[in-house]
Swiss-Prot record:
<dbReference type="InterPro" id="IPR017298">
    <property type="entry name" value="Ure2"/>
</dbReference>
<dbReference type="GO" id="GO:0004602">
    <property type="term" value="F:glutathione peroxidase activity"/>
</dbReference>
<dbReference type="Pfam" id="PF00043">
    <property type="entry name" value="GST_C"/>
</dbReference>
<feature type="domain" description="GST N-terminal">
    <location>
        <begin position="59"/>
        <end position="143"/>
    </location>
</feature>
<dbReference type="GO" id="GO:0051219">
    <property type="term" value="F:phosphoprotein binding"/>
</dbReference>
<dbReference type="InterPro" id="IPR004046">
    <property type="entry name" value="GST_C"/>
</dbReference>
<dbReference type="GO" id="GO:0006808">
    <property type="term" value="P:regulation of nitrogen utilization"/>
</dbReference>
<dbReference type="InterPro" id="IPR004045">
    <property type="entry name" value="Glutathione_S-Trfase_N"/>
</dbReference>
<dbReference type="Pfam" id="PF02798">
    <property type="entry name" value="GST_N"/>
</dbReference>
<comment type="similarity">
    <text>Belongs to the GST superfamily.</text>
</comment>
<dbReference type="InterPro" id="IPR036249">
    <property type="entry name" value="Thioredoxin-like_sf"/>
</dbReference>
<feature type="domain" description="GST C-terminal">
    <location>
        <begin position="152"/>
        <end position="301"/>
    </location>
</feature>
<dbReference type="GO" id="GO:0003714">
    <property type="term" value="F:transcription corepressor activity"/>
</dbReference>
<comment type="subunit">
    <text>Homodimer.</text>
</comment>
<comment type="function">
    <text>Plays an important role in the cellular response to the nitrogen source. URE2 gene plays a major part in the repression of GLN1 and GDH2 genes by glutamine, and is required for the inactivation of glutamine synthetase. URE2 gene product may catalytically inactivate GLN3 in response to an increase in the intracellular concentration of glutamine.</text>
</comment>
<dbReference type="GO" id="GO:0010621">
    <property type="term" value="P:negative regulation of transcription by transcription factor localization"/>
</dbReference>
<dbReference type="GO" id="GO:0032447">
    <property type="term" value="P:protein urmylation"/>
</dbReference>
Length: 301
């Protein structure tokens, strides 16, 4: 029996297992060594965050994220699309880096993502939707235009509606479905079913919106066959424009679309097959996944 195994069962099995003095001392030493190693690792992790905040860069952006956090990659996609200079610090949750006092000063919720804008007096922003709106609004102000956003207040409101739908309905429901499927302390089938059904409802909303955009696109571009499509004698799937990309707002990809990418990329883990169940969502996601900035961001570049 290894020392680690002995220690892990020590308190529960002490009355039934006869441990000699030498074995007891070895167990205690092993336990102490493990505690010291954990403390040293924790100090190293904390010092990494402390050192960063003590010597912040003078320009660019710093994104605080996590390797398994879709919302962090969501912000990385927008930074990459806008070609903004940024560095990502992937926090180590196992050692509590998200609870480091310096990090909590910029995100009182102690979660990722959070962003520091070193161009703007180290301004910090937290919550993915707020970060995205900050980035595109600032980009529009500084450059006069922003393809991912709009200078039209009506279009801005439409983009914002989808962005808030993603942050309040899409991401949390997938997150809960993942939690109850894989991480909850005991099986709760009703919770898995409830959240998975809600994810499907959310995708139904997006599917309908994209299908309406596709129909409008085909009717606008495929003029010679428009009457047949309207009469129902020729299905829209016969149009040469059936696989053209369509977007939630306007004729281009915006943050309304791109904010969905990282979560769409993991939804198969809760048993939802986008290609089969939501073909428009699948095509839409496929178009976005091919964008060079999206590829770079999802790689963690």
């Amino acid at each position: 029996m290894s020392g680690a195994h002995t220690i892990s069962h020590l308190s529960a099995g002490l009355k039934s297992v006869n441990i000699g003095d030498q074995q007891q001392n070895e167990a205690n030493l092993n336990l102490l060594q493990q505690q010291l190693e954990n403390e040293a690792t924790s100090q190293t992790q904390q010092s990494r965050i402390t050192q960063f905040f003590a010597q912040q860069p003078s320009d660019g952006y710093t994104l605080f994220s996590h390797r398994s956090a879709p919302n962090g990659f969501k912000v990385a996609i927008i930074l990459s699309e806008l070609e903004l200079p940024f560095n990502t610090i992937f926090l180590d949750f196992n050692h509590g880096e998200q609870r480091a006092p310096e990090f909590v000063t910029i995100n009182p919720n102690a979660r990722v993502p959070a962003l520091i804008d070193h161009f703007n007096d180290n301004t910090s922003i937290w919550e993915s939707g707020a970060i995205i709106l900050y980035l595109v609004s600032k980009y529009l102000r500084d450059n006069g235009e922003c393809a991912l956003w709009s200078d039209n207040i009506v279009e801005q409101s439409q983009i914002s509606s989808w962005l808030f739908f993603q942050t309040s309905g899409h991401a949390p429901m997938i997150g809960q479905a993942l939690h109850f499927r894989y991480f909850h302390s005991c099986p709760v089938p009703s919770a898995v079913e409830r959240y998975t059904d809600e994810v499907r409802r959310v995708y139904g909303v997006i599917e309908m919106a994209l299908a309406e955009r596709r129909e409008a696109l085909i009717m606008d571009l495929d003029v010679e066959n428009a009457a047949a499509y309207s009469a129902g004698t020729t299905p829209l799937s016969q149009s040469r424009y059936f696989d053209y990309p369509v977007w939630l707002v306007g004729d281009r990809a915006t943050v309304a679309d791109l904010s969905f990418v990282p979560w769409n990329n993991v939804v198969d883990r809760i048993g939802i097959n986008l290609k089969v169940e939501f073909p428009e969502v699948y095509k839409w996601t496929k178009y976005m996944m091919r964008r060079p900035a999206v590829i770079r961001a999802l790689r963690g570049d």
